[in-house]
Amino acid sequence: MAKNKGVRIVVTLECTECRSASASEKRSPGVSRYTTEKNRRNTTERLEIMKFCPQLNKMTLHKEIK
């Protein structure tokens, strides 16, 4: 028998400043993304976490994307 879906899901976090930054401000091209898990029962809204962005070489706000 198959198990039902768990409460923990995998989410992707994307840097909010990488999209608006010009190429001259970035250390390397692209957008910083992290994958993590969240508990659907405890955290119903989208995650917003300060994480290190290697493209901008500083701590930036990372928001959950679909």
UniProtKB/Swiss-Prot annotation:
Presence of keyword Secreted: no
Gene Ontology MF: a single term: structural constituent of ribosome
UniProt cross-references to Pfam families, sorted A to Z: Ribosomal_L33
Keywords recorded for this protein, A-Z: Ribonucleoprotein, Ribosomal protein
GO CC aspect terms: cytoplasm; ribonucleoprotein complex; ribosome
GO biological process, one term: translation
Record has Protease as a keyword: no
InterPro entries membership: Ribosomal_bL33, Ribosomal_bL33_CS, Ribosomal_bL33_sf, Ribosomal_zn-bd
The family this protein is said to belong to: Belongs to the bacterial ribosomal protein bL33 family.
Protein name: Large ribosomal subunit protein bL33
Organism: Synechococcus sp. (strain CC9902)
Organism placement in taxonomy: Bacteria, Bacillati, Cyanobacteriota, Cyanophyceae, Synechococcales
